[in-house]
Amino acid sequence: MLAVLLSPVSQAATQAATQAAFDPLLEEHQSLWLQGGQAVTPPAPDSDASLAADLTIHAALDLPEIRPLLLRYSRQHPERVLHYVNRSALGLEAQYLQAPLTPQADLMISSAMGLQYRLANQGHALALEAPNLAAWPANSRWRDELYAMSFEPIVMVARRDALKRLADLDGLRNPRDVLRSHRDFWHLLETRREQLRGRIISYDPRRSGSGFTYAVSDARQSPRYWTLVRAMGQADARLVSTTGAMLEALASGEVDIAYNLVGPYAVTFARAHPELVVIVPEDYVLIQRRLAFVPQQAPHPEAGEAFLDWWLSLQGQQAVASDSQLGALHPEVRGEGSAQHMREQLGDALRPIEIGPGLLATLDRLKQASFLSRWVLEFEAPAPFAGEASQGQGQGQGQGQGQIQGQAPSATQPELNQ
């Protein structure tokens, strides 16, 4: 349940944070121009980029994950100049809403499922008719306007040397047996708190929209979630706003275990860092799906629809499976890199975040503040006295135990980053 009573302090903190919100339009973003699979010179800064390109895609999806697919599509359509812009989810929405009646992008893709659903629900998305879109599974789209493009597990990542140390402490032969589930993670925080103090990292749900969505989904899936939040705080867990920040902290040796990371980013990073291991929880796995739509005012709506139709085609989905870690959703694509392969391995443990009105609940300010108020109370709850057993869900208000990167704790509006 999202609804809990707000304390006056939490309400004041939320109002202050809203008034002092950062400007997402000033954030840095990545841009890529392609034609025929080759990089091309971008137009002059004072020109209209949406008119210089034949296909403009604005997305909250890191370039390393989508670049191979953009190159493949560009080679297949050499007549088109393709412009790809990557922003945070909040920056993506803010840029669009600054001038929603002005032609900007031909396709918008975001991991912030609630934001995408809200824009489509408010009438910003075109109804599409391309054949592969019409055949897309009903549970992976909303009407004919909003389409799921990925099937991404939310995972944990750990340092191999840390798992080895913890396994030795518990007399386990296989270090992988130390951490296989959410329950194992909670057990480690309870029994190895001193060894892990300051060595855990996760999303700050007050500063990350994705982190907030995962926190809400965790709370819906597990009655133990609030004791997990309390245990993280008592272990001085560090909180950041992106999966990338977690991965960098792991690689540098600053932390040992990261919780609730975007799976594709984690897998790609771990391939270059063999000291890390990606853990897909065995008890339940949250599944994020990036959602895409063609804006009503797209400068080249037919180009945006054509790209999305290619992505969801059998050919496109085979490319998604082979060229990325995003997860192919097409029912005929099997094997590594497909949602079907994940279903065969994990079965009922998969928990896809549903595409529907429930997403709007994560955007309601009062419900956000209520949930975050409870989250702060648990995370900042004081550690038990020596020898005292952990006692369920915390109600006390103590000094904050966790380490929040970049700001002091407060129940603020999430910044809806990736």
Positions of PLM-derived features:
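A bilobed periplasmic-binding-protein/Venus flytrap-type ligand-binding module shared by bacterial periplasmic
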Residues: 157-162, 214-217, 288-300, 319-320
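Mature extracytoplasmic/periplasmic domains
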Residues: 295-359
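A ligand-binding cleft/hinge motif common to bilobed small-molecule-binding domains
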Residues: 114-118, 251, 255-275
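Short beta-strand->loop
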Residues: 125-134, 145-148, 274-286, 295-297
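Alpha-to-beta junction loops
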Residues: 79, 100-108, 124, 196-198, ...
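Early extracytoplasmic/lumenal segment of secretory-pathway proteins
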Residues: 22-118
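Conserved C-terminal helix/tail region of periplasmic/extracytoplasmic solute-binding proteins
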Residues: 352-418
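Extracytoplasmic ligand-binding site segments that recognize negatively charged/polar headgroups
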Residues: 60, 64-67, 104, 111-116, ...
